[in-house]
Amino acid sequence: MWLGALLDTLPTPALTIDRTTAHRNAERMRERCRALGVRLRPHVKTHKTLEGGLLATGGTRRGIAVSTLAEARFFADGGFDDILLAYPVPTARLEECAGLARRLDAFHVLLDRPEALASLRQRPLGHGKRWLVWLKLDCGNGRAGVRPTDPAALELAQAIANDAPEEVTLVGVYAHCGNTYGCSGADTIQAIARTTTNAVLSFVAALRQAGVPCPQASIGSTPSCSHPIPEMSQLTELHPGNYIFYDLQQTQLGSCQPQDVAIRVLTRVIGHYAHRGQLLVDCGWAALSLHGAGAGQGPQGCAAIDGHPELRLVGLTQEHGLLEHAGGQMDFGRFPVGSVLALIPYHACATAAMHPVYYVHEEGKVVALWHPVRGW
């Protein structure tokens, strides 16, 4: 019922996506990968939609990374294939993984411990299928993965490749340079990207020297892939995800310019409180998330108000937000009750996860509704 609607008529809070900007972001990342001569495997966890997946893959429906089994099933149902679960293989849900592996031409899993490999071997796929395994490397991010300098990493890769080749195949190595999210500017982002790339390439070289074939080498994060370095051309693929929308955090990091941010959360003014100098709006943390509130930032770190740098977000409860003038008197006449403001969220992935529908717009009108998958 909302197709063709003007944005200021939408029920709020409403998550909106500028179609032109998202298309431009997707094409720019594809072009970066083409220029490097590497494959783009877009991570779809930011949007979790078939439409976003089509946009990111250029319509091929092949070669994506997902963060949950629910996403994997959803995209498989939507005709996607060559799906990588970018999460250490959940051995408690191995039957679900096996079902996807049998169903798809290529369903890839990550592992970083021998016990996970043993679980895969205890659950052979049969029917001529093999588990497609990537070794997860930790090149400084400090989350999942084995350190490439640890001798156990080489031993695990050798075991994946050699212990049961009729059941398990080593596809490649996978590293997420999430430590780029602690950067401020292209130079520091590229320094981490270079360290990660070199660590991955050195590990692949060590594998090959040991007689272990390693066809694929993949790294990713939106900051690193937004400022690619020449060394990345020696990899086989990149796997960023947030870039399709970008967000306030990415502009602060230096990954993008403000005009590259496609996502907004529309909110209505629902109250004036002159004695406090505050506007009340109908967007709380349930429509925005609390990402960005850390490091002493408080609510103002969670979002910026588009077109109104004089306003700041000072309070967030579940369904309410409070705005103040950053350095003077609030002009309530400029923001009557019922007027609509647009918030630029700090973290698009977290904010998008709060909404059941995205209103995609062009020239001020809704042109599509995207419905994301939810759950795990």
Curated annotation (Swiss-Prot):
Its EC number is 4.3.1.18. GO terms for biological process: D-serine catabolic process. Inhibited by hydroxylamine and aminooxyacetate. Its cofactor is pyridoxal 5'-phosphate; Zn(2+). Transmembrane segments: none annotated. CDD domains: PLPDE_III_DSD (cd06817). Pyridoxal 5'-phosphate binds at residues 174, 181, 222, 241-242. Belongs to the DSD1 family. Catalyzes the conversion of D-serine, an allosteric activator of the N-methyl-D-aspartate (NMDA) receptor for L-glutamate, to pyruvate and ammonia. SMART domains: D-ser_dehydrat. This is D-serine dehydratase. Pfam families: Ala_racemase_N, D-ser_dehydrat. Keywords: Cell projection, Cytoplasm, Lyase, Metal-binding, Pyridoxal phosphate, Zinc. It is an enzyme of class 4 (lyase). It is found in: Cytoplasm; Cell projection, Dendrite. Optimum pH is 8.5 (at 37 degrees Celsius). It comes from Gallus gallus (Chicken). GO terms for cellular component: cytoplasm; dendrite. One of its GO terms (molecular function) is zinc ion binding. May form homo- or hetero- dimers. Zn(2+) binds at residues 347, 349. The keyword Transcription does not apply. The keyword Transcription does not apply. The modification N6-(pyridoxal phosphate)lysine is found at residue 45. Expressed in kidney, specifically in the proximal tubule epithelial cells (at protein level). Expressed in the liver, specifically in hepatocytes (at protein level). Low expression levels in cerebellum, brain stem, midbrain and cerebrum (at protein level). In the cerebellum, expressed in Bergmann glial cells and astrocytes (at protein level). In the cerebrum, expressed in astrocytes (at protein level). InterPro entries: Ala_racemase_N, D-amino_acid_metab_enzyme, D-ser_dehydrat-like_dom, D-ser_dehydrat-like_sf, PLP-binding_barrel. It catalyses: D-serine = pyruvate + NH4(+).
